[in-house]
From Swiss-Prot:
<dbReference type="GO" id="GO:0009535">
    <property type="term" value="C:chloroplast thylakoid membrane"/>
</dbReference>
<dbReference type="InterPro" id="IPR005953">
    <property type="entry name" value="ATP_synth_csu_bac/chlpt"/>
</dbReference>
<keyword id="KW-0813">Transport</keyword>
<comment type="subunit">
    <text>F-type ATPases have 2 components, F(1) - the catalytic core - and F(0) - the membrane proton channel. F(1) has five subunits: alpha(3), beta(3), gamma(1), delta(1), epsilon(1). F(0) has four main subunits: a(1), b(1), b'(1) and c(10-14). The alpha and beta chains form an alternating ring which encloses part of the gamma chain. F(1) is attached to F(0) by a central stalk formed by the gamma and epsilon chains, while a peripheral stalk is formed by the delta, b and b' chains.</text>
</comment>
<feature type="transmembrane region" description="Helical">
    <location>
        <begin position="57"/>
        <end position="77"/>
    </location>
</feature>
<comment type="function">
    <text>F(1)F(0) ATP synthase produces ATP from ADP in the presence of a proton or sodium gradient. F-type ATPases consist of two structural domains, F(1) containing the extramembraneous catalytic core and F(0) containing the membrane proton channel, linked together by a central stalk and a peripheral stalk. During catalysis, ATP synthesis in the catalytic domain of F(1) is coupled via a rotary mechanism of the central stalk subunits to proton translocation.</text>
</comment>
<comment type="function">
    <text>Key component of the F(0) channel; it plays a direct role in translocation across the membrane. A homomeric c-ring of between 10-14 subunits forms the central stalk rotor element with the F(1) delta and epsilon subunits.</text>
</comment>
<keyword id="KW-0066">ATP synthesis</keyword>
<dbReference type="GO" id="GO:0033177">
    <property type="term" value="C:proton-transporting two-sector ATPase complex, proton-transporting domain"/>
</dbReference>
<dbReference type="GO" id="GO:0045259">
    <property type="term" value="C:proton-transporting ATP synthase complex"/>
</dbReference>
<keyword id="KW-0406">Ion transport</keyword>
<protein>
    <recommendedName>
        <fullName>ATP synthase subunit c, chloroplastic</fullName>
    </recommendedName>
</protein>
<dbReference type="Pfam" id="PF00137">
    <property type="entry name" value="ATP-synt_C"/>
</dbReference>
<keyword id="KW-0793">Thylakoid</keyword>
<keyword id="KW-0375">Hydrogen ion transport</keyword>
<keyword id="KW-0446">Lipid-binding</keyword>
<keyword id="KW-1133">Transmembrane helix</keyword>
Amino acid sequence: MDSIVSAASVIAAGLAVGLAAIGPGIGQGSAAANAVEGIARQPEVEGKIRGTLLLSLAFMESLTIYGLVVALSLLFANPYVG
């Protein structure tokens, strides 16, 4: 039974990292594209747009890091393995 739980934990860890990276990756690409478009339209507000972009990218990246933490806890501190 432990081998099944271990195998399921490895699969779940891979899915956790993979799925946690898809959403923020798409969001970061969209945010960067819109920021470049906004800077191209109004170059005088470049500093304000860049600051907001960097803050929002950090928040989006934190979601991926949370997925990594879940994956590492499943691999190394698995509560389901007896």
